[in-house]
Amino acid sequence: HSDATFTAEYSKLLAKLALQKYLESILGSSTSPRPPSS
């Protein structure tokens, strides 16, 4: 079914965007002056 394919692709796209946002927030916070968590 085409709807199922669309949903799967949409979920993949959302996951990709979420991961990108997550990485950006991590990279953005790592540049600010504060001690590393590790």
Swiss-Prot record:
Its main location: secreted. Expressed by the venom gland. InterPro entries: Glucagon_GIP_secretin_VIP. Glycans are attached at residue 32. One of its GO terms (cellular component) is extracellular region. One of its GO terms (biological process) is regulation of blood pressure. Belongs to the glucagon family. This is Exendin-1. The lineage of its organism: Eukaryota, Metazoa, Chordata, Craniata, Vertebrata.
